[in-house]
Amino acid sequence: MDRKQVIHSLLNVIAFELLEFIKESESSFEERWVPSAHIKDRLELNFISVPIENKQYGEKGWFFAIVARMLEDQNLVEYQKKGSRAFYRSVRP
């Protein structure tokens, strides 16, 4: 397996774990919509995304957004926005 395949394989493992967390959390929220803030906070998925020399004001949820989009592209999660808040839930067959 080359480096690209290994990295993409690991991203798929991360996406699966994120999906499982969303599924486990759904019962605690109305209509199963899990707030993205809950997901990012519980899994500590906010990171600083710029080099140390650059300036950024705090951690951002870019990594979570990428992985959540991977799940959305595979039709494994649904996304909903209410006001400024984002929510996710698993797609049920």
Model-derived regions, located:
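Short, Lys/Arg-enriched N-terminal segment that forms or immediately precedes the first helix
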Residues: 1-8, 51
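Positively charged, polyanion-binding regions of nucleic-acid-associated proteins
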Residues: 5-33
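Short, positively charged loop/turn segments that connect secondary-structure elements
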Residues: 28-33, 44-64
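A short acidic, leucine-rich amphipathic alpha-helix
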Residues: 38-40
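Short, hydrophobic-biased segments on the C-terminal half of alpha helices
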Residues: 65-69
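A short, conserved structural fragment
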Residues: 72-81
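Short, cationic-aromatic polyanion-contact patches
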Residues: 81-93
